[in-house]
Amino acid sequence: MQQQFPIDLLKQCIFLAGPTAAGKTETTVSLVSRIPNIEIVSLDSMCIYRGMDIGTAKPSREMQLQIPHHLLDIIEPHEEFSVAEYVEVARKACEEIVGRDGVPLFSGGTGLYLRAVLRGVFEGPPANWEIRNRLQAQADDAASRDDHFFLMRQLEKVDS
């Protein structure tokens, strides 16, 4: 089963995707001059984190004041945030934008988020916390012993 972004909502969105420094900002400014009710929905997996302004190409405060932006600085770096959660908050943002007669413009470079919005999120089995906790304890133990190659050895066992 897949969590799906409503098709009627998708039809009202514009998508502008590409890597950092591809010209998305300039294209956005050009689009805003032609479609003044555009609001940007960040399609960037790093810009969602508060305090991660350096190295993420997060829009400047000036740009954010000129053009409404959504899904920036929404969680702390230590918090878990899944692609399914991204789709949900993006859907809500789009519904609010469209409700104001705005045009959602998804802009960013995280292909996983783009695919999830366009194609849905596969809902597989839940995480096995017993295994995750055991592996985390092993990694923590290796780190306490300065065993920098522990994880590499574990991967070699699994891959062979």
Language-model regions, residue ranges each:
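Phosphate/pyrophosphate-binding catalytic cores of soluble transferases and nucleic-acid-acting enzymes
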Residues: M1-S160
